[in-house]
Structures are given as C-alpha cells and as structure tokens.
C-alpha cells in the first residue's frame, strides 16, 4: 500500500462520535476502478445500510473497513484508530499482520456464504476465535458460545455440524461467531443473498435484534423492507462513489438522484 498524506483534523464533533470513518478511499483491480474517493462516517450505534448494483463497490468497501483489502489511497478509522496502517512522519505505513489481526478482532464480519469451519460444531465455530486470540479459556469461550447460540435461537443445535444445518441456521451461527469477540462494529456482506427465500426472515430477525443493542452495524443488502424498518441511514453506491446518502425516508421514499430512482425501480 502506498503512503498517503494525513488529512487535516476534522471540525466540530458530531453528536455521536464516529465509529467508522472512511477517508478518500480509492481501490482498483486490474485497471477497473472499484472505489473512487469514498468519504463516509458512521456514528457509534448507527445502523447503516449500503445499497447499490453489482460491481458498485459495496463488498470492497466492507473488506477495506477491516483491511481485508488494502486501499490504493485513503484510509479507514474504527473508533478513531487507523485500520491496517499507522501514522509515521505525517504519512501512513502498513502495520504487521499480527497487529492487523488484533484490530480485526474488534470488527465482526458476516459473509454471504457463512464461512463456517465444516469440521467444527456450531458451538466450536462460535468459541474458536476467543480461544485462538487468548481472550478466553476453552471452557469460558464455550460457555459464552452457548449463550450466543441461544441469542440467535440455536441453543438446541450447538452440537450440530454445518452440514446438518439449513442455510439460515448456518448464517445465524456465523452471526453468533461474529459476536463472540464482542466487536464494536459488525459488517454484513449481503447476509441473506445465499439463502432460500423462506429462510431470509429468520436471519433478518436476528440482525433486527442486534440493531437495538447499540452495536454499530453496516449492512450490504438488497432487502429494501429491512432497510426501511431498521436503518438509521442509507447509502447508495454506484461506480465506486456515494451517489446518495440520508435517512431511509428520504433515500428510499423520495430519492433525489436519478440513478437512485432507477435502481430502486428495478429492485422494488
């Protein structure tokens, strides 16, 4: 990652401090521009829904937030701390992998295809990260994992393996796993896109419950009804840029930009 100049200090603080700040994010793959100078702030405890067509940069933005993708320029801060980089003589330098892993432990990530360990039970999938990071003993981690599985409605499936679970159940295990390290921010990358339609509701119900917990959520989804009901703010991306941003009542019900209106007319 090339070094980039630090931005000037921000002005007056928001009512709620920023949990996530994206500053001038640029990213391309093979000459294809995927993120084109995105600036974004997500307040602590906010639920942000990110909408946009395929290829608009939604997943890349999420992956950049926890440094699964290195930006070509710009940087991301979580809780005021640069992610994946450090300040060095007025510029940014890449952190070592061990430091990056520590930072990622504070950012939950729920993938669209579950990414569970197939050889571990639901219980051990949830307990794995706290043990691996030294945050808990195996007994402590398993006790908390049982509580988290109960929270997502799967206490009775604790000893089941992923192959024995439906897609919706696997995704709920993945959400419990994301909660195991008690992150301040959780990223959801189209968490219902791989599910049969009848299973979508059970996963959205868990995310709705999380939305009331005070955890900052950033959710990439095409579930417009969910966005209307749960989101504090909606961002519409197209061509790697923020086209429109605001409360659901504005972006979804009275969008200002023609591209937003065109997109919504196709998905509603």
What are these regions (language model features)?
Residues 120-128:
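Short coil-to-helix segment of the ABC ATPase nucleotide-binding domain corresponding to the Q-loop/switch region
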Residues 161-165, 169:
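Conserved ABC ATPase signature
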Residues 180-184:
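A short, proline-enriched helix->beta-strand linker immediately N-terminal to the Walker B motif
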Residues 186-189:
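Catalytic Walker B motif of ABC-type/P-loop ATPase nucleotide-binding domains
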Residues 245-246:
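ABC ATPase "signature
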């Amino acid at each position: 990652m090339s070094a980039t100049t630090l931005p000037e200090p921000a002005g007056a603080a928001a009512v709620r401090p920023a949990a996530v700040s994206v500053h001038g994010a640029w990213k391309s793959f093979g000459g294809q521009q995927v993120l084109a100078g995105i600036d974004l702030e997500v307040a602590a405890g906010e639920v942000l829904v990110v909408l946009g067509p395929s290829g608009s940069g939604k997943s890349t933005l999420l992956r950049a937030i926890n440094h699964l993708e290195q930006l070509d320029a710009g940087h991301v801060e979580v809780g005021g701390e640069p992610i994946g980089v450090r300040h060095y003589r007025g510029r940014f330098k890449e952190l070592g992998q061990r430091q990056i892993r520590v930072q990622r432990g504070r950012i939950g990530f729920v993938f669209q295809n579950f990414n569970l360990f197939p050889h571990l039970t639901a219980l051990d999938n949830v307990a794995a990260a706290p043990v691996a990071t030294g945050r808990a003993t195996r007994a402590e981690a398993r006790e908390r994992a049982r509580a988290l599985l109960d929270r997502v409605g799967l206490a009775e499936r604790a000893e089941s393996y992923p192959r024995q679970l439906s897609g919706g159940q696997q995704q709920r295990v993945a959400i419990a796993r994301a909660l195991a390290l008690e992150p301040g921010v959780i990223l959801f990358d189209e968490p219902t896109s791989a599910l049969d339609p009848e299973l979508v509701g059970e996963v959205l119900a868990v995310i709705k419950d999380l939305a009331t917990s005070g955890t900052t959520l950033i959710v990439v989804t095409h579930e417009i009804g969910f966005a209307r009901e749960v989101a504090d703010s909606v961002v519409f991306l197209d061509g790697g840029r923020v086209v429109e941003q605001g409360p659901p009542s504005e972006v979804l019900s009275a969008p200002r930009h023609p591209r937003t209106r065109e997109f919504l007319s196709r998905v509603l």
